[in-house]
């Protein structure tokens, strides 16, 4: 019988991140300046940690992880296990082999810690006095608050208002880590004041929260802005997930036919899949990749592939990506970490070239959360609402394998736990 839990020894924790940019089939379209206004690239160079900006444009395939940072990863519980979902397989009566990567086991309950610790490590090296960021579902804000507490740095978080207001327990956790948490849009910023003047009850969006974080960093000396998704260096830090997973499949002498991840801006999907995609591009393996999304924000599924801003106010450079429009209005969902207008430029290019498939699910989230309940009752673990989209897609693929008799090996990334999201499940499932 195949192992149910595949644990990589600590000594085998990856020593470098993987940067896919040199292996892409086409050059990645570079960021562009808009036709009017100040230089956005110059602005970013003032508010983002310099080493992170250097990594953003790196042409190195492998970027060494500093030893002190590897120790922080180990302290945070890496390497993380890969599990075989045998009870779920049995319930579905599928010939497919189902696996899930456990990023829910981090101290804050999500994969976001992987880049939070990296960005903060470099911030301290450069003498940064504080960090500021945005957060949607709250996982990124929690991760940065956690990392900042270890580094003894102040951390300011602008949190999408409609989620901030109902996730009281996660807000408390952020504050216990020392985070200074503000609902977004907020009167603290010019961006927020303008939006609230037009609509005092605006629910907020990740694009708005990013704009507020950038403005805060610009106006507060010594502060750096940290972004939790989309950018190249963020995805690179997250490749530790996929690099571990490659070695874990080697341990059980099995290789995945399909990798699945939920998709908002792309950090968890990219971190899980890019090391595998790189091997596909280099002719070393065959595998397919599926991004699972909400119809509330189907950026990489239904967006336009064009240049657009990454934030609501247009403070960032223009990025070539699949976008719904940087100022688009998206309906609130409980999987709010997926509610973002744009997709990572790297993943957008790969999608445009046909290397990534997509699937979308209804805004009401009923089918997605029913999959969560099935997973909880078979595997015993509660995933985050965002991760539930990956689980829903994995179950759907397993059911298709039952119909066709195909013995696929399918793996999904469970990007976080849902212990602080119970209200969302209660509301949708009428519990």
Predicted features by range, described:
Residues 65, 79, 195-233, 252-253, ...:
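Active-site/ligand-binding loops adjacent to catalytic centers
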Residues 263-271, 365-431:
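Claisen-condensing/thiolase-fold acyl-transfer catalytic domains that form or cleave C-C bonds
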């Amino acid at each position: 019988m195949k192992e149910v839990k595949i644990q990589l020894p600590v000594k085998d924790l990856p020593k470098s991140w993987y940067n896919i940019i040199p292996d892409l089939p086409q050059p990645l379209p570079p960021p562009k300046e808009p036709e009017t206004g100040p230089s956005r690239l110059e602005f970013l160079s003032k508010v983002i940690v310099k080493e992170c900006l250097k990594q953003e444009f790196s042409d190195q395939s492998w970027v060494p992880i500093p030893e002190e940072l590897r120790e922080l990863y180990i302290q945070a519980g890496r390497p993380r296990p890969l599990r075989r979902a045998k009870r779920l397989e049995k319930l579905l009566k599928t010939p497919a082999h189902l696996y899930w990567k456990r990023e829910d086991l981090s101290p804050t309950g999500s994969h976001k810690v992987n880049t939070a610790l990296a960005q903060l490590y470099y911030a301290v090296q450069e003498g940064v006095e504080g960090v500021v960021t945005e957060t949607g579902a709250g996982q990124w804000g929690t991760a940065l608050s956690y990392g900042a507490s270890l580094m003894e740095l102040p951390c300011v978080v602008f949190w999408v208002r409609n989620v901030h207001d109902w996730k009281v327990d996660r807000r408390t956790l952020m504050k216990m880590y020392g985070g200074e948490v503000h609902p977004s849009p907020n009167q603290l910023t010019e961006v927020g004041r303008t939006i609230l003047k037009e609509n005092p009850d605006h629910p907020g969006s990740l694009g708005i929260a990013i704009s507020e974080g950038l403005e805060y960093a610009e106006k507060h000396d010594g502060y750096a802005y940290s972004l939790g998704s989309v950018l190249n260096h963020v995805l690179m830090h997250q490749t530790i997930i996929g690099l571990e997973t490659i070695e874990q499949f080697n341990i059980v002498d099995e290789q995945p036919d399909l990798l699945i991840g939920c998709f908002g801006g792309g950090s968890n999907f990219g971190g899980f899949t890019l090391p595998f995609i790189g091997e596909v591009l280099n002719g070393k393996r065959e595998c397919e990749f599926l991004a699972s999304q909400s119809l509330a924000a189907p950026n990489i599924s239904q967006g336009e592939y064009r240049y657009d801003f990454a934030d609501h106010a247009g403070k960032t450079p223009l990025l070539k990506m699949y976008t719904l429009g940087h100022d688009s209005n998206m309906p609130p969902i409980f999987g709010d970490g997926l509610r973002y207008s744009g997709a990572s430029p790297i993943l957008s290019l790969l999608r445009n070239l046909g290397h990534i498939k997509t699937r979308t699910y209804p805004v009401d989230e009923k089918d997605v959360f029913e999959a969560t309940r099935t997973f909880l009752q078979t595997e015993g673990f509660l995933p985050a609402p965002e991760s539930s989209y990956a689980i829903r897609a994995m179950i759907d693929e397993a059911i298709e394998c039952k119909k066709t008799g195909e013995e696929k090996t399918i793996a999904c990334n469970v990007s976080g736990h849902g212990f602080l999201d119970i209200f969302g499940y209660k509301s949708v499932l009428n519990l």
